[in-house]
Regions:
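Glycine-rich beta-strand-turn "strand-cap" elements at beta-sheet edges
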Residues: 2, 38-49, 75-103
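An amphipathic, aromatic/His-enriched active-site/gating alpha helix that lines ligand/cofactor pockets
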Residues: 20, 24-35, 56-91
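Short, surface-exposed ligand-recognition loops at beta-strand->loop->(often short) alpha-helix junctions
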Residues: 9-18
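A cross-taxa feature marking solvent-exposed loop/turn segments within ectodomains of secreted
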Residues: 15, 30-32, 46
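Short, well-ordered beta-strand segments in beta-rich or mixed alpha/beta enzyme
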Residues: 2-8, 38-68
């Protein structure tokens, strides 16, 4: 499984706006190979808010196809938001080991 992350720093007090922005971008759920999406918020930084966008894909190729898709272009074509600080920090991972709770 392939995981893409994007670390985004925003001005303090704009977390709800960023969350709503991602809430309105559900088109990725229809993309081939898409597994799931999570938006994580870091706690405790007094100077800014930090989020980690996490998307999981069946393969890196599925992720790359999405990056070239019309839905990706649409999701990233809106006006710039002035509360985002700089550019996101992208990272990619391959899951090598995972555990689940025993029931």
């Amino acid at each position: 499984m392939f995981v893409g992350t994007n670390r985004i720093k925003i001005k303090k007090g704009y977390g709800k706006e960023l969350e709503e922005l991602f809430r309105s971008r559900g088109e990725v759920a229809r993309e081939p190979g898409f597994v799931d999406f999570e938006l994580w918020r870091q706690e405790g930084d007094p100077e800014h808010e930090e989020y980690l966008v996490v998307s999981r894909w069946e393969s890196e190729e599925h992720h790359n196809q999405w990056l070239r898709s019309d839905s990706f272009k649409q999701a990233h074509s809106g006006p710039p938001t002035d509360y985002i600080m700089g550019h996101g920090e992208f990272s990619n991972y391959q899951i090598r080991l995972a555990y689940q709770a025993e029931k």
